[in-house]
Amino acid sequence: MVDPVPEEEKEGAEPGGSEGDEATASEPPDAQGAQQPAASSASASAAAPRKAEVPCGAEGGRREQSPLLHLDLFNFACPEAEGSRYVLTSPRSLEACARCAVKPVELLPRALADLVREAPGRSMRVATGLYEAYEAERLAKLQQCRAERERIMREEKRRLFTPKGPAAAPASASASASASALSGGSSSSCSSSSSLPASPASRVARRTSPSPPARSRPPPAGSRTGRKSHSLDSLSRRRDGALSSESGASSSSYSGESLRELRWPPRASARNSCPAGSASSAPNPLGRPSALALVPLTARSFSLGDLSHSPQTAQHVERIVRQVRAERGLRGVPERDRKIAALMLARHQEERLLLEQRAAAHGQWEQQRVRAEQRREREEREKQRALERGRRAWAAQVEERRGRRGREEREAARRRQQQCERSEERRRELAERQGLLRRERVERAARDDRLRKLQQEQNLKQREEGRQEGRERAELVRRERAQRAARARERQEGQLQREKRELSRAERARHEALLRGRVRQQQEEREGLRSSLEASLGRAQENYEQLQEQRARELRERARREELQGRRAKEAAERKEREHQAHLEALARAGERRLQHAAQVAEEAVQQKARRVVQTRLEKERAQRANKEKVERDEDCRRRELLQAIGRKLERSEQLSRERRSALESARSTARASFHVREKVREETNTRSFDRMVREAQLHASLDRK
């Protein structure tokens, strides 16, 4: 739940900017978005410390930012955090959830597809009912946590605006009493939430706290500036009291939890009452001084530059440089290589401390993961048992429905068989009477037409009545279904089953009505079709005879027209041939005239082109002679200049080679000294394998050859 800053706090309650419990981001309680994956949590944790820096920088020069304060952007640099399905949230929201005994993950919305995927045997209607029940429960919990969070915000504002002096003592006493009551009342919620895997940022925050009693020391209740001081002097005093002579600075394990402890000590002590939230009580299996003991409550992480500039690191580097000078007899080591050696030593110290912290945190995380696995297994077993019960009930209902449907189908098949037998009997009778009824075809056709019209009108009337009845029944079923759905949201699973039975009964009645209407319609259509076919057969025979006579007349008329068109086409073709021959003769005469004119023009063009070619050749010969003389003169000048430049380059190259040899000797000496210093640092910080020793021997041999 995101913790927005109220208008009163923006105006004067906390002048340091937005509060520190915006240090982490999460799914808001009043937002209905989907659950964030671990990658979004990681990005939120990377962006959250930047929010935590805002109060220090928003003072406008009243308080100087400490250059020793650094943020830890590697809260999720572990394999366990990659698959985490939990999100970070603000301290107010966490405290509200703890007071209401609600896990933060229960406030996240779940998609309907997740419920269907978890129980593949359930029908979509059952999954929808479960989803609605889950959403109603989630919204109720969300409203409860939201109200509790508003109550916490009012308590904080009341505590912030409490006047200093004697009147502040009762307020501080009541605040401590409420904090102790909160810690006692939320012990069950702490125990329940401890079974869940904690988010990586909160895990790192708990890892940095040395002991639970150290976190329960709040500053004076009336001094807000004491809780928010981040000056250089206070940070220096904290660092001097926290760091020993062996470790020049603590590792980069910043967490927003320590910043929250400085600003909200009552809530920090309430959270400390949960025994599963501290990792400092875990034993150190390696037998080395634990990194958790090096970071007290008010300590801050320091950069690699702070570690490299510590006096112990500088003395260590000086000792290595003196040792290399004494052993190798080389010149002094440059300042840059001294800094590199100091950084190597500082990085080794930082990695060692970070490994110890991660080992302790991983042990705590593994315990919480095992507890979460056990809880998930129990829930899965309960879910499977409920699923098996639902599956058995569903199988019994399906079997009962299948038997009922089989009986209905057998009854319908028997009725269809009887109807088919009756229709077959009528067809045989009609076939026997067909010879007798052929003479009365005209009268029967008229009578059949009248009967068919009457039957069609009756069919239309019955069909419209059936449709109206179906619509009324469907509307009735829809209203009943809406009423049952409204009642089902108020009642439980029993009423859902009754609704299903009523729905299936209504559907069965509608299905039977549709079947009866369809059978009656098919019967009527079959009788009407038979009578219409007999009438259309007689009309078709008469039409066929008329068509035969008409087709013979059309064929005779078409033959006469085609003969007339053939004579006309032959005359037109002869006339067109004569015109074409005359046109070809005219074209031949015009082509001869054009050829004579073109030959004359081509002869004149050839003579003119020959004259131009002779003149162009003479001009090119004169230009070639002039260019040849100019090229010879330029070549002589270039040759003389090239000889002079070669002489100057030879002199310059000899001078540069002498300077290069002297600089190379100096650089090799410095490189040997730097190399030996770094090797000394590596020998003290790293373990040497056989392959590393072989490579070092080869490198020494190549340096000695140089």
UniProtKB/Swiss-Prot annotation:
Pfam families: DUF4659 (PF15558). Residues 28-49, 179-209, 242-257, 664-674 have a biased composition (Low complexity). Residues 1-11 have a biased composition (Acidic residues). Residues 360-624 form a coiled coil. Residues 210-221 have a biased composition (Pro residues). Keywords: Coiled coil, Phosphoprotein. Residues 368-386, 448-529, 548-580, 651-663, 676-706 have a biased composition (Basic and acidic residues). This is Coiled-coil domain-containing protein 177.
